[in-house]
Every structure is written in C-alpha cells, then in structure tokens.
C-alpha cells in the first residue's frame, strides 16, 4: 500500500472528521479522480466478465475472484476501500461511497441502484463541506436451510 493510501485509510478508520481543504481531503479527491477514470472503463461498453474482473481488481487494488460479476453502470468515488468475496454479483446503477470501508462477503447479490455511503457531511451549515467517516459497511449473505 502506498504511503498516502495508508495515511488516508488509517485516518478514516479512526472516524476522524475530514476537514474541507485538508491534506486528507485532497487525498480523497485524488482517489475520486482515479476511480472516475477506472469506472469509465468499466462502464464503457462490452467488457467480457474477465475484463470486468481485471478492471474491478485494479479499482480496488486487490485481486477479485473470477466468479465476480457486475452489470454496469457502476459508480464509486474511491474504490480502494472495497473488498469483495467470491460469487458476488452487483447489478446495474449501484453507487458505493467506500472511503470508510466496504466489505462484501461471499455469495452476496446487490440489486439495482443500491447506494452504500460510508461518509456523511456535517449538519452544521458552517462546516457542511467537512465529512465524518461512519466506519466499515459489511454486506453479508445469510445462508438458510430450506429443507423441510
């Protein structure tokens, strides 16, 4: 992990406020620019499932299992704080704000137009541009025994 990445993710893992214009805020905007570039490639046409896996791996900075499937369009304003298990399906028009962390477990299906947000703007009008990380979001599959 790059030094700036570590600095950012250590900071947000402590749920400290990200002040507008701060070094952490600037890093976050750099992640967003990178994510926009990669999601344009993910969303740009007829990628094979393997190509989508490779692009999503590049977006997250982690190896994504070949069983991963995604129907574009897909949006994120970070990408580097998403982890994905096996047999994950993300349907179209989802938007993940993953700066605070998003862990998607095995066998998870995510429906159309799902928004997952891990940051929130402060309510104070004078500090509205500041944000607070809300911690890691966990998406899990609940396996049930349907045998009678």
Outline where the language-model segments fall.
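Terminal amphipathic alpha-helical/low-complexity segments used for targeting or macromolecular assembly
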Residues: 1-65
């Amino acid at each position: 992990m790059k030094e700036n990445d570590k600095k950012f993710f250590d900071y947000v893992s402590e749920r400290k406020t990200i002040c507008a214009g701060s070094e952490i805020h600037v890093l976050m905007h750099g992640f967003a620019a990178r994510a926009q570039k990669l999601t344009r490639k993910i969303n740009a046409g007829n990628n094979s499932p393997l190509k989508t896996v490779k692009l999503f791996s590049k977006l997250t900075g982690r190896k994504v299992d070949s069983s991963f499937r995604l129907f574009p369009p897909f949006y994120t304003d970070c990408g580097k704080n998403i982890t994905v298990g096996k047999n994950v399906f993300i349907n179209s028009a989802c938007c993940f704000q993953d700066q605070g962390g998003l862990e998607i477990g095995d066998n998870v299906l995510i429906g159309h137009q799902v928004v997952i947000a891990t940051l929130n703007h402060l309510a104070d009008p004078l500090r509205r541009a500041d944000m607070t990380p809300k911690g890691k979001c966990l998406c899990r599959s609940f396996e049930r025994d349907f045998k009678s």
